[in-house]
Amino acid sequence: MSKKLTTAAGCPVAHNQNVQTAGKRGPQLLQDVWFLEKLAHFDREVIPERRMHAKGSGAYGTFTVTHDITKYTKAKLFSEIGKQTELFARFTTVAGERGAADAERDIRGFALKFYTEEGNWDLVGNNTPVFFLRDPLKFPDLNHAVKRDPRTNMRSAKNNWDFWTSLPEALHQVTIVMSDRGIPATYRHMHGFGSHTFSFINSDNERFWVKFHFKSQQGIKNLSDAEAAQVIGQDRESHQRDLLESIDNQDFPKWTLKVQIMPEADAATVPYNPFDLTKVWPHKDYPLIEVGEFELNRNPQNFFAEVEQSAFNPANVVPGISFSPDKMLQGRLFAYGDAQRYRLGVNHQHIPVNAPRCPVHSYHRDGAMRVDGNFGSTLGYEPNNEGQWAEQPDFAEPALNLDGAAAHWDHREDEDYFSQPGDLFRLMTAEQQAILFDNTARNLNGVPKEIQLRHLRHCYKADPAYGEGIGKLLDIDVSEFN
């Protein structure tokens, strides 16, 4: 017997083929409440899309510890070799809307939610170790530059390059995006990075600075612009389809988690700002340390409920993992939760995909869509005479030594914009450099020459061969930008 249709209130629906009218050809009646409910719900099915990372795919999996790092962190998910923790992953493009093609040249989001016994840990990263910006005040400007032009409502290469080249610190990220790794072939064939500098705190209350790396066990595969155009012409959901089908076919993708560890005191002595999101830490100084691996092995049963409504927030950390003075990270600690309260509501943490797997004791009350019992008759204030849900000073972090006057400090005092992009360029093979030249020149085509020259000057400062290679393809003589 087939399941029977009801209203949202559970009442039987007698007619779902024809509206109720006054006579065979008469007007529709207002008392046709099923029609009213059905259309009213339809009118409200679409929630606000994410301002960035709107197009994405997700899956559940398991993280397993393979190496001991307890001397660096007291986080229980790393407490013993073999320990497993459930997680949810969401991979995305960044600039495009929900209907954008997967195989666009763009950064990829790489967000993980670990459902630990101490609460949810959200690691909200990308497939690149750096970013365009150092200062979160410019993040809305980046968004506006890569989104649609306010006059034409089209994506604008001019706007992209005008903004990127006005921020010389963006060259490191631009170099990666324009390289052969700018279009991953699938989500399975890309690395992930926490990108920011975070901190570990161990059982002795010692702090270490840490960067997270996720190495794809499937290897790296990328698409050229021509290959991507062909893929997009056939399937705009190519990455989503690949991830979904690989898990359905039990070809479970895996990534190895590695970390770079910096003693807290080193931050004051290294010749660069270790909290600068436009720079990486040299591996020769801070080598990768293997921690574990995660496997994605279960697809969501409902995309909207589990992927679209998933919410990742870098402010969600557990004891033993914390933040750093990274300005971009500090800005995201507010922005992500605030965006989720707008997009999903103040109680979005009760949506099953976002809900912790451990007990929650909070004084947060009421709000739209509060459907979990609202903590019943438990007192809603603290301190209280019953000692309910008191603070936990045992989990206080060690003090972080800070100094300096409060001011709008200009990060441009550090003018080392070009050494690391130059190092990256020189690590490339001749073939990879040629691909970088070709991709960059193609994307700069049609952009005003003034903007082209600005980018060429930056590339030339990173390495003369970098600027010359692109300039040759744009038919611009080196004398115009050296």
Swiss-Prot record:
UniProt-annotated catalytic positions: 53, 126
Top-level division of the source organism's lineage: Bacteria
Enzyme Commission number: 1.11.1.6
Keyword Cell cycle assigned: no
Names of the cofactor(s): heme
Pfam families per UniProt: Catalase, Catalase-rel
Keywords: Heme, Hydrogen peroxide, Iron, Metal-binding, Oxidoreductase, Periplasm, Peroxidase
Gene3D superfamilies associated with the record: Catalase core domain
Binding positions for heme per the UniProt entry: 336
Entries under SUPFAM superfamilies matching the protein: Heme-dependent catalase-like
Database matches in InterPro entries: Catalase, Catalase_3, Catalase_AS, Catalase_clade1/3, Catalase_core, Catalase_haem_BS, Catalase_immune_responsive, Catalase_sf
UniProt cross-references to SMART domains, sorted A to Z: Catalase
EC main group: oxidoreductase
Compartment annotation: Periplasm
MF GO annotations: catalase activity; heme binding; metal ion binding
A GO CC annotation given for this chain: periplasmic space
Catalysed reactions listed for this entry: 2 H2O2 = O2 + 2 H2O
Induction pattern: By hydrogen peroxide.
GO biological process: hydrogen peroxide catabolic process; response to hydrogen peroxide
Family: Belongs to the catalase family.
Function according to Swiss-Prot or TrEMBL: Decomposes hydrogen peroxide into water and oxygen; serves to protect cells from the toxic effects of hydrogen peroxide. Could protect cells in nodules which have a high potential to produce hydrogen peroxide because of the strong reducing conditions required for nitrogen fixation and the action of several proteins.
PANTHER family: CATALASE
Name of the protein described by the UniProt record: Catalase
